[in-house]
């Protein structure tokens, strides 16, 4: 992300927000159907879906594509814009600050900036993912004779009415843990893989200054794998906290009590599968826009 870091403070921040928003929206459209399946696997009350394929098949046969796989996309689409804008602007601004005012090593700058970016993003993400998770499992809950909202605004209104404005941040602790550690893994993997690929192929072309398209795509896909693999148990806990209105400790106890250790990894396969194209697109689009 050298192009973004070279610009002035205000100009760079504005461009990071714009470019991050566009990249985030594109990535969300790619990953959302897979995310719906993941959330349903994570939050099922019993072993309704023994496999990922059984969940996909059930969702398609009973709800179709739009209502089944894209239920509740409006909220996370806006959230993806806010999340990625926050991630990239926080990361690049923190990197600039550390580079200018400290003697922290380049790797240290990446790790610290990634953690700061993830922490900031968690504040934006919690309300968005709360609404998203509720909508993604709403059709299942309606089928089980529970009255649930299946639209964004009524869902938000119901949360505020029942729990107040602070209720929108149900699951903040789980999201903070996931995003702070995940931010480190996400940015560090991207920067390290990109630099490694660039350095290796610079031997053939010493004058080449920019990364090739395939290098950006591989780096972004690798970052997505690292992020999701490293924080998946925290993501499972967060999903249960938000769909069942329980604390972090109770969510951990409930998951482990019902499914054991493997319960924290339900839906991991499809999550890693979706992580590659979605994150490859996010980083490629962001880097391309930043270079304009």
Curated annotation (Swiss-Prot):
It is a multi-pass membrane protein. It holds the Pfam family Mito_carr. It comes from the Eukaryota. Keywords: Amino-acid biosynthesis, Arginine biosynthesis, Membrane, Mitochondrion, Mitochondrion inner membrane, Repeat, Transmembrane, Transmembrane helix, Transport. It is found in: Mitochondrion inner membrane. The chain crosses the membrane at residues 14-34, 69-89, 104-124, 171-187, 213-233, 267-287. Solcar repeats lie at residues 11-97, 105-196, 211-292. The keyword Mitochondrion applies. Signal peptide: none annotated. InterPro entries: Mitochondrial_Carrier, Mitochondrial_sb/sol_carrier, Mt_carrier_dom_sf. Its main location: mitochondrion. The keyword Ribonucleoprotein does not apply. One of its GO terms (cellular component) is mitochondrion. One of its GO terms (molecular function) is L-ornithine transmembrane transporter activity. Present with 432 molecules/cell in log phase SD medium. Belongs to the mitochondrial carrier (TC 2.A.29) family. This is Mitochondrial ornithine transporter 1. The gene is ORT1.
């Amino acid at each position: 992300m050298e192009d973004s870091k070279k610009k002035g403070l205000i100009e760079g921040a504005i461009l990071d927000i714009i470019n991050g928003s566009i990249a985030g929206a594109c990535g969300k459209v790619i990953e959302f159907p897979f995310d719906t399946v993941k959330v349903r696997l994570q939050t099922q009350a019993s072993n309704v879906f023994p496999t990922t394929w059984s969940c996909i098949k059930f969702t398609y046969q009973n709800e179709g594509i739009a209502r089944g796989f894209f239920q509740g996309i409006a909220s996370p689409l806006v959230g993806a814009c806010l999340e990625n804008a926050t991630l990239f602007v926080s990361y690049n601004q923190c990197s600039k600050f550390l580079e200018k005012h400290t003697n922290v090593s380049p790797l240290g700058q990446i790790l610290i900036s990634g953690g700061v970016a993830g922490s900031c993003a968690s504040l934006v993400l919690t309300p968005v993912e709360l609404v998203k998770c509720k909508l993604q499992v709403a059709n299942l809950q309606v089928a089980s004779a529970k009255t649930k909202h299946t639209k964004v605004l009524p869902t938000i209104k119901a949360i505020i009415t029942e729990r107040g404005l602070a209720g929108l941040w149900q699951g903040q602790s789980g999201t903070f843990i996931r995003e702070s550690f995940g931010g480190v893994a996400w940015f560090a993997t991207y920067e390290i893989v990109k630099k490694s690929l660039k350095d290796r192929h610079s031997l053939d072309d010493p004058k080449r200054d920019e990364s090739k398209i395939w290098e950006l795509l591989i780096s972004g896909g690798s970052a997505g794998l690292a992020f999701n693999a490293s924080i998946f148990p925290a993501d499972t806990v967060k999903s249960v906290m938000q769909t069942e209105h329980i604390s972090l400790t109770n969510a951990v106890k409930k998951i482990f009590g019902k499914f054991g250790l493997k319960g924290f990894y339900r839906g991991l396969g499809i999550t890693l599968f979706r992580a590659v194209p979605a994150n490859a697109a996010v980083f490629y689009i962001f880097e391309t826009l930043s270079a304009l």
